């Protein structure tokens, strides 16, 4: 089997390259590494390396700088978002505490109404006790008056009986 050679100027493949027969191996397919002998053959010029490095940097550096700037902007935006989120959380906590405060006010109104009712009851009881004390005082005064009248009545009766009892006549 023959290995095709390099294409001819008209683009048609010809036979094996010059100096190679059909059974020979093609160059580059040997058992040796493709890098062997390459280092000795190349003479590295510092200027060429520098120009290649500058070209590589000039090609990729703007994209890298834009990426770096975009990352910095994203980081700043993320910090702003975190601050905003913390503010919203604090607002939510304030709203939640406002709900607690509203519940406390509702409870305070409830207990205030209870206190008002208790105060009304106490005033009513105070009025009743005052009336009862006045009535008791009047009854006591009436009883004392009746007792005094009875005592006076007894004394009058005693005096009358004394006057009605026979008296020995005085000897004159």
Swiss-Prot record:
Residues 1-36, 135-172 are annotated as: Disordered. One of its GO terms (biological process) is gene expression. It is found in: Cytoplasm; Membrane. Keywords: Coiled coil, Cytoplasm, Membrane. It comes from the Eukaryota. This is Biogenesis of lysosome-related organelles complex 1 subunit 6. The lineage of its organism: Eukaryota, Metazoa, Chordata, Craniata, Vertebrata. Homodimer. Octamer composed of one copy each BLOC1S1, BLOC1S2, BLOC1S3, BLOC1S4, BLOC1S5, BLOC1S6, DTNBP1/BLOC1S7 and SNAPIN/BLOC1S8. The BLOC-1 complex associates with the AP-3 protein complex and membrane protein cargos. Interacts with BLOC1S4, BLOC1S5, DTNBP1/BLOC1S7, F-actin. Component of the biogenesis of lysosome-related organelles complex 1 (BLOC-1) composed of BLOC1S1, BLOC1S2, BLOC1S3, BLOC1S4, BLOC1S5, BLOC1S6, DTNBP1/BLOC1S7 and SNAPIN/BLOC1S8. Interacts with SNAP25, SNAP47 and STX12.
